[in-house]
Amino acid sequence: MNFGFLGTILTILLVVGFITNVVLAFVIIFLERDRRTASSTWAWLFVLFVLPVIGFILYLFLGRTVSKKKMEKNNGDELNAFEDLVQDQIDSFDKHNYGYINDQVIKHRDLIRMLLMKQDAFLTENNKIDLFTDGHKLYEKVLEDIYNAQDYIHLEYYTFELDGLGKRILDALETKLKEGLEVKLLYDDVGSKKVRLSKFKHFRALGGEVEAFFPSKVPLINFRMNNRNHRKIIIIDGQIGYVGGFNVGDDYLGLGKLGYWRDTHTRVQGEGIDALQLRFILDWNSQSHRPQFKFDQKYFPKKIGDKGNAAIQIASSGPAFDLHQIEYGYTKMIMSAKKSIYLQSPYFIPDQSYINALKMAANSGVEVNLMIPCKPDHPFVYWATFSNAADLLDSGVNIYTYQNGFIHSKILMIDDEISSIGSANMDFRSFELNFEVNAFIYDEDIAKQLRQAFEKDIEQSKLLTKEVYDKRPLSIKFKEGLAKLISPIL
């Protein structure tokens, strides 16, 4: 064997790898600086130079960003009416001409105005909201609503598995297609990795439309592992909407290896559905190769049926957005809290400013409660979550680890007044990389229901104490340290 020749080849590969990494470092530092945080930049530089070849491969899958132009294609002037509505609402807050009947709207007008800086986060009142924390009860209602649909059904999901639950929903959708209804389904290509468009042959033959979000251009490999559509939305006839944390699949009914699945989802009736419909149309048009999906009046009908008193803003965020609205909304809520904060997130990897906000709240006398899982579904993410949560112990934050299965709920509630429920975790991936949607709800009844659900969860959780945390073995300390170091790219 010619070891000299092999050595030469290896040297050439290492030199090429080093030069490639230098070029990528230049791109990350100078060409993508407006799309990355400092922590993300440093994390990628660390990976590139510590792991020259592997770092390049990781960058291909995880490091690239998405352009705003790509996400806004096919929408043209259709957004003008919504932009005018948002501007009118901003003007009303600036001029103190409120005209709103909800007391929490006036009290939290600063948060509302901030969220209005995105065209789809307009404020609506008179919404009726139902909360779901159990997958079986949620999808029983979803299936009932699908079978009662009269005009159209739109679904957008990060994970849409074609297992027991997925097939039941697909069967219901195909039944409605046979009745002549319009049905559109948008799923994420990575989140629904077991699903391919070919699986929907019968659905499409019946007239159903389906699109994959950022599909792979190479069989079996998707080079865009980041920038995924993590949203979970259903709109039925413009009268009923769903948004929250549950995906579609048997795992979310508690039938997977993680056991019982604890999540939070909302069913909305009222004007807030228009914002969900807008979000769906924008996302569909960004991925579809068909003619533009028009903002037809039938998708924004006059609302009928039960009306409630809840005010809602539907806030979206993603890598193509100028402002990280959901992250800003979370932080503003924390800084506004006077009495209590209730947080649930399966992944807790925010930046230091977010952690500092929680510390300041706790040190100011606000009761701060955070609930995270007791078991990992992604090991590195779990150890980073555990480390970040424990960082709050010295400030008096109550940290609970949920024991009854896996908690996937993403909620923030303050002062028994306002809350946020949706798809966004409290981590860098949700704040910076993925496309997310959350409902910011200004309603005391919903806030109190969330607190009661949280208190029920405490009964099936363990309180993490400083004494217990300090006794963790060296192996766990090592895992936490490594996970925290690379957390900006997890």
Curated annotation (Swiss-Prot):
Its EC number is 2.7.8.-. Residues 225-252, 403-430 form the PLD phosphodiesterase domain. GO terms for molecular function: cardiolipin synthase activity. It holds the Pfam family PLDc_2. One of its GO terms (biological process) is cardiolipin biosynthetic process. It is a multi-pass membrane protein. Its main location: membrane. It comes from the Bacteria. The lineage of its organism: Bacteria, Bacillati, Bacillota, Bacilli, Bacillales. It is found in: Cell membrane. It is an enzyme of class 2 (transferase). This is Cardiolipin synthase 1. One of its GO terms (cellular component) is plasma membrane. It catalyses: 2 a 1,2-diacyl-sn-glycero-3-phospho-(1'-sn-glycerol) = a cardiolipin + glycerol. Belongs to the phospholipase D family. Cardiolipin synthase subfamily. It comes from Staphylococcus epidermidis (strain ATCC 12228 / FDA PCI 1200). The chain crosses the membrane at residues 9-29, 42-62. Keywords: Cell membrane, Lipid biosynthesis, Lipid metabolism, Membrane, Phospholipid biosynthesis, Phospholipid metabolism, Repeat, Transferase, Transmembrane, Transmembrane helix. Disulfide bonds: none annotated. The active site is at H230, K232, D237, H408, K410, D415. Catalyzes the reversible phosphatidyl group transfer from one phosphatidylglycerol molecule to another to form cardiolipin (CL) (diphosphatidylglycerol) and glycerol. InterPro entries: Cardiolipin_synth_Firmi, Cardiolipin_synthase, CLS_N, PLD-like_dom, PLipase_D/transphosphatidylase. The keyword Transferase applies. Signal peptide: none annotated.
